[in-house]
């Protein structure tokens, strides 16, 4: 059986399984090329919502590297890199939006789930529904229907 993949969801699950026992969650996994080199970039956050430190990145990287070496999920050579969410923080779960109430988010609908494409402040979160202040009105959407990221950098850690 060939277990090689370039599927980000498989890589996401592999990385998340390796780092979650250490108190981290994987926010996203992307693959990009720098010249001929393939880079697998893993963006993590701490489950306790404290800032991600360099020591955290090192620990997560070591755990994931061991698992990636064991499973060998990618056919070609690649470089596995880890980073904290920073200013490009993806907002994936209701609790991520809740932490950022008052800040602007860049929002777009997932394919087949509406026609949203806007940047607006996060006003409220109730269950899995996020309300934005958009065009002077409240606009509520389900977290599962959108892809969102922070559009402004917070003045303090949230």
UniProtKB/Swiss-Prot annotation:
HAMAP family (UniProt xref): RimP (MF_01077)
InterPro entries: Ribosome_maturation_RimP (IPR003728), RimP_C (IPR028998), RimP_C_sf (IPR036847), RimP_N (IPR028989), RimP_N_sf (IPR035956)
Keyword Thylakoid: no
Range of residues in the leader sequence: none
Subcellular compartments: Cytoplasm
A single GO BP: translation
Alphabetical keyword list: Cytoplasm, Ribosome biogenesis
A Pfam family annotated for this UniProt entry: DUF150_C
Protein name: Ribosome maturation factor RimP
GO cellular component: a single term: cytosol
Domain of life: Bacteria
Family: Belongs to the RimP family.
Described function: Required for maturation of 30S ribosomal subunits.
Protein species of origin: Deinococcus radiodurans (strain ATCC 13939 / DSM 20539 / JCM 16871 / CCUG 27074 / LMG 4051 / NBRC 15346 / NCIMB 9279 / VKM B-1422 / R1)
Xref: PANTHER family: RIBOSOME MATURATION FACTOR RIMP
């Amino acid at each position: 059986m060939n277990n090689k993949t370039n599927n980000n969801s498989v890589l996401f699950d592999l990385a998340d399984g390796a780092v979650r026992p250490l108190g981290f969650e994987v926010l996203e996994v992307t693959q990009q090329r720098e010249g001929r080199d393939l880079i697998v970039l893993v963006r993590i956050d701490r489950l306790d919502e404290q800032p991600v430190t360099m020591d955290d990145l090192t620990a997560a990287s070591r755990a994931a590297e061991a698992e990636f070496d064991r499973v060998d999920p990618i056919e070609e050579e690649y470089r596995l890199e880890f980073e904290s969410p920073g200013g490009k923080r993806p907002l994936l779960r209701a609790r991520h939006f809740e932490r950022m109430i008052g800040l602007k988010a860049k929002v777009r609908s997932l394919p087949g789930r509406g026609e949203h494409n806007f940047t607006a402040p996060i006003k409220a979160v109730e269950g899995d529904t996020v309300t934005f202040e958009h065009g002077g009105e409240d606009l509520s959407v389900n977290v599962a229907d959108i892809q969102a990221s922070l559009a402004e950098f917070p003045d303090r850690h949230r």
